[in-house]
């Protein structure tokens, strides 16, 4: 259990950890729950103190930050996340990868596989459709939603059984049902579903993923070559969180599902989330996964003040550590997001607004217009480790009369080649065009300027500088 000191936490059963030797039952005894609670406090204290909870946690300057190694960017160890997972990633809602460790290495992802199962389910089904539990689904074993052969439930209830308690039975139920919908003539609905999983992964841009079943078990009869990458997992989580139904399901701390048994009687199942970070510091959902080969895995979504990211940790050493790693990655990312004023200038216009530029009026040889931002208080949010911010100011052709508020140019801010802000420049003073007599004088002035090889209009000048990070 992970909980920040002083925050409310929910005591939930440990995720079943499948073993090649035999299945391990969920922790249900008070003693085991108490041990889990104690572990959560230890982990929370460690997070507060800024130290890893296991000796394996480490900082690697070979990790990637915004597409380059930390070494290449000159980022020191104290500005990098201290995590245990061998493979990890932080990705923004727009697909920007802020951090990666072994992010393209093909590894096992265990029950994180169910994120893709959920995606295909919501894309192919209405939530009130009814599904029936087959013998194959009821007997898959390991982590389950407690479904029995012949049980009938809605797709939504099965989806909850899939994502909240990580039910392998629910995964097979949905795979069989959706596979049959995809190809009504199929003789192997689950195989049809798995094929669709791989096709959908490719459409998402996943380049290192192979699914072989809908639940992620990778041993005994399920042993094979199934694999994915931290980057691919982030793409799946990003896609899943676009769906409101999935967002609501993974945000549920606990849930009940209603099932009609084979004998016609109704009964309910209580389920607790395996996401021990849910609701803490912006965590809005996630999916765990654990097998001997995959280690302890977790992908999650965070949203703080509208800034949404997706984190992935694969092959952490313990249940607690995967959550510590996840919290560390989220805090690292948000801790390096800074807000800067777009108008980085000490000079003011006559109206008291930030002076961004003096832009030449093309009908005059010696007049300029003071330009400010369309929103003088505008700010941009940048990631401080992504490099310096650069500024480009463009000037419009200012002919004729210019009025206060007229667009006179624009400013573009980029960081590491990525556009982070664009804003119009507007006139902050009136600028009349020349009358006929003045226009004649301008022409005479320009004649002399041509002879002397001088500029024919007042030169525009950028006053503001790029914001400092």
Feature-to-residue mapping (PLM):
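N-terminal targeting leaders characterized by basic, low-complexity, disordered sequences
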Residues: 1-25
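Detector for glycine-centered tight turns/loop "hinges" at secondary-structure junctions
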Residues: 6, 29, 95-96, 150, ...
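Active-site-adjacent loops and short helices of periplasmic peptidoglycan-processing enzymes
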Residues: 6, 12, 55-231, 235-244
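Positively charged, low-complexity intrinsically disordered regions
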Residues: 9, 34-37, 359, 368
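Bacterial N-terminal signal peptides that target proteins for export
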Residues: 24-41
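Alpha-helical transmembrane segments and their juxtamembrane interfaces
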Residues: 42-46, 124
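C-terminal segment of classical bacterial N-terminal signal peptides
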Residues: 45-54
């Amino acid at each position: 259990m992970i909980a920040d000191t002083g925050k409310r936490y929910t005591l939930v059963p440990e995720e079943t950890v499948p073993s090649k030797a035999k299945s391990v039952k969920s922790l249900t005894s008070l003693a085991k729950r108490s041990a889990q609670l104690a572990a959560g406090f230890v982990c929370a204290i460690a997070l507060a103190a800024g130290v890893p909870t296991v000796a394996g946690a480490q900082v690697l300057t070979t990790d990637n930050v915004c597409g380059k190694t930390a070494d290449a960017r000159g980022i020191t160890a104290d500005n990098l996340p201290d995590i245990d997972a061998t493979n990890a990633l932080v990705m923004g809602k727009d697909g920007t990868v802020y951090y990666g460790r072994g992010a393209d290495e093909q590894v096992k992802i265990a029950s994180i596989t169910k994120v893709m199962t959920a995606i295909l389910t919501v894309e192919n089904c209405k939530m009130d459709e009814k599904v029936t539990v087959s013998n194959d689904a009821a007997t898959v074993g390991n982590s389950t939603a407690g479904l029995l052969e012949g049980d009938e439930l809605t797709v939504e209830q099965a989806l909850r059984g899939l994502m909240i308690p990580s039910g392998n039975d629910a995964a097979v139920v949905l795979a069989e049902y959706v596979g049959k919908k995809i190809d009504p003539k199929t003789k192997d609905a689950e195989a049809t579903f798995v094929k669709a999983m791989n096709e959908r992964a490719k459409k998402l841009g996943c380049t290192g993923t192979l699914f072989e079943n809908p639940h992620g078990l990778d041993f005994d009869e399920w042993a094979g070559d199934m694999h994915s990458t931290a980057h691919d997992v982030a793409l799946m989580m990003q896609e899943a969180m676009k769906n409101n139904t999935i967002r609501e399901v993974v945000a549920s701390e606990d849930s009940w599902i209603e099932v009609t048994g084979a004998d016609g009687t109704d009964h309910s199942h209580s389920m607790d989330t395996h996401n021990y970070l849910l609701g803490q510091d912006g965590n809005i959902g996630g999916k765990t996964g654990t097998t001997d080969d995959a280690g302890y895995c977790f992908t999650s979504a965070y949203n703080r003040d509208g800034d949404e990211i997706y984190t992935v940790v694969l092959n952490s050493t313990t249940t607690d550590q995967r959550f510590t790693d996840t919290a560390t990655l989220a805090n690292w990312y948000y801790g390096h997001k800074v807000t800067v004023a777009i108008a980085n200038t000490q000079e003011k216009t006559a109206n008291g607004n930030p002076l961004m530029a003096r832009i030449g009026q093309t009908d005059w040889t010696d007049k300029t217009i003071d330009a400010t931002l369309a929103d003088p208080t505008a700010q941009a949010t940048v990631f401080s480790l992504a490099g310096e911010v650069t500024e480009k100011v463009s000037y419009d052709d200012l002919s004729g009369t210019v009025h206060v508020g007229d667009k006179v140019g624009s400013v573009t801010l980029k960081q590491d080649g990525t556009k982070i802000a664009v804003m119009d420049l507007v006139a902050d003073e009136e600028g009349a065009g020349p009358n006929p007599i003045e226009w004649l004088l301008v022409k005479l002035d320009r004649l002399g300027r041509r002879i002397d090889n001088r500029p024919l209009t007042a030169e525009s000048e950028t006053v503001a500088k790029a914001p400092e990070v």
